[in-house]
Amino acid sequence: MKTKMIAVAALAAVAAQAEFKIDRTAMSEEYWKIWNDDVQKKIDADIEKYRKADGVFALDGVPDGAEVQVEQETHAFFFGAHIFNYGQLGKKEWNDRYKELYGTLFNSATVAFYWRTLEPYPYAPRFAERYEDTENFWNSCPQPKEQPHWRRPAVDPVIDFLRGRGCRIHGHPLVWGNSSWQRPTWIWDSFCPESEKRALEERTGVRIPSANWRLPVGVRDFELGGEWNAAWNKVYKMLSEEEIAALVPTYIKAYNYFLEKRIRDIGERYGSRVDSWDVVNESATDYHRWQDEKAVRGTPCQKSVYGLMPGDYTYKGFQWAAKYMPKTAWLNLNDYNMAPYFFKQAKDLEANGCRVDVVGSQMHLFNPAESVNIALGKGPEHLRPEGIAARFELLSNAGKPIHLSEITITAPDMSPKGQMIQAIIMRNCYRAWFSVEKMNGITWWNVVDDCGAPGEPSISGLFTRDMRPKTAYFAMDDLINGEWKTKTVAKAAGGKVSFRGFRGRYRLTWKDKDGKEQTKLAAVK
């Protein structure tokens, strides 16, 4: 308890010290011409229209004209971040400060369910915490990035922590073809008979690579992903899906079996405790390139950019998720590919009986040079006001709420100006995204510098590696806990109070006719 109080006090003190103020000189005149006053007024108007609502509440014993203190406690909108570094930062002080963000800055968290590291061996998922998942292990670990479960904490303690903090929980992902991060190597290595592997090689001259079992689980052959994809691409040119399936039927049967089993096991353990799922991640390219833009083709296997996948794997993923998850859990289709065929895929899945509740969109600004270009007014179209509007107008055609599920905005460098550039880009983009009618949540990706995946920028966090807040943290906190939180005084009339505020839970406080303070919790919806 004492440590928690220290962490809370530390964050509060930091926030008090550095109230965010925009330094417009960090950006060029060209940038501010793009994000001009008219643009900002339009964003403000849309936020007022789409993110706020009117509330009218009856108050027992309130005198006419009495002042009612109106204070928002929680948001209905989801402001999230992944929590992949839970307990892994190397010092208790850093871990405590990291944990304190969930339930204060973030009311939602994305929890890692990546198959490869969640189930490094068949029938042995890493749900429960073991010693290797504890802070003691990570605090004494000299090279954390070399550990196979870096950024992949055991699920049970993370779920318990988030529920205790009152956070919404989002699971990511159930189905994904990615051969470096998701597909367990043991499905091919252990459940495809050698006779089938030889038959495929004899027919095509292509040897599908296996994992190097001399290396530790999770570390072994990270480059295998590229080799795996390249080998299957050669096979695709020679054989149809039906011909491939005839050569490796046991593998395809095993993949289908273990994929359904995975979703069933996760649903049985976490279905009632997780609010939403990225059921299928990044499958739009396959839908367009290999499926002829048909959600259901009936083929036994699926040629995929990720290597061979089960036939109709996106459709099956949603069918299994609907079967094993409660109806209260949202089922999301998530992708970085915002081509028109992405929202077409969502509609096609629905037309074939799948429940798709939310569409997820990613936006990663990984290159520090791009942040410099944006500051100069030369940035990519999709991060300009008109580009943001066009992108989400298109995605809104799916007719679903939108979860901006993975956001990266890197600083160009760690100078004060570089940090301010990151903060201003983030602030303007968040405001524009928050103003989109169908947006229901925004999830920042890497909270801490130098804690991302290989290839991701080391300075894209809101905090430094030793958990010192960056300018972008103050800018985000200023939006979520300042500009976008309603705190006002309203006058009672006729035993009621009315006001307009951001959707969420409120505490209403007033004095009755005897001068006694009264409170009521109310929700603006």
Task: Kindly give the residue locations of the regions a language model identified.
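Short Pro-Gly-centered beta-turn/loop motif in secreted/extracellular proteins
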Residues: K91-L105, S498-R507
